[in-house]
C-alpha cells in the first residue's frame, strides 16, 4: 500500500491499481484504465479508506460532479462497470449487504 503526501495524498496504489488524483489517471497492473469521472471519484473514495464500507448515499455524494440528481441504484451500475474494468480482480470491490460497498484490503 502506497500513499504519497499523507495530508493531501495525490496517488494511492493498492493491489496493482494506481490512482492519481492530480493527473486524473488510473492504471491497473501498469495498463491505463479508461474510467468515467464518476467511476474515478468512486474508486478514489473507496481506495482512500480500504476496508471501510461506504453507503450508496456516501458514494453518490462523492460523485456529485456528474450525477447530481442520480438515484441510489445508479451507484450499483457504476460499481458493476468498475468491477468489469478491474477483471480478473473484480472482487476488490466488495458488496456489504445492507450498507453499500468497500474496497478490500486483502
Language-model segment annotations:
Residues 103-106:
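C-terminal edge and immediately downstream basic/flexible tail or linker adjoining helix-turn-helix-like DNA-binding
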Residues 15, 22, 99:
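Conserved protein-kinase catalytic-loop position immediately C-terminal to the HRD catalytic Asp
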Residues 1-13:
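Basic, amphipathic DNA-recognition helix from helix-turn-helix-like DNA-binding domains
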Residues 9, 91-94:
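Core catalytic loop region at the nicotinamide-binding pocket of NAD(P)H-dependent oxidoreductases
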Residues 25-77, 81-90, 97-99:
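Positively charged, aromatic-enriched patches within helix-turn-helix-type DNA-binding elements
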Residues 6-8, 19-25:
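A short, compositionally biased
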Amino acid at each position: 500500500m502506497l500513499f504519497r503526501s499523507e495530508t493531501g495524498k495525490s496517488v494511492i496504489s493498492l493491489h496493482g491499481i494506481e490512482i492519481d488524483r492530480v493527473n486524473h489517471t488510473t492504471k491497473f497492473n501498469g495498463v491505463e484504465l479508461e474510467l468515467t469521472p464518476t467511476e474515478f471519484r468512486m474508486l478514489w473514495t473507496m481506495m482512500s479508506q480500504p476496508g471501510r464500507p461506504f453507503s450508496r448515499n456516501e458514494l453518490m455524494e462523492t460523485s456529485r460532479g456528474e450525477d447530481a440528481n442520480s438515484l441510489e441504484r445508479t451507484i450499483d451500475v457504476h460499481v458493476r462497470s468498475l468491477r468489469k474494468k478491474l477483471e480478473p480482480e473484480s472482487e476488490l470491490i466488495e458488496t456489504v449487504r445492507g450498507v453499500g460497498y468497500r474496497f478490500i484490503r486483502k
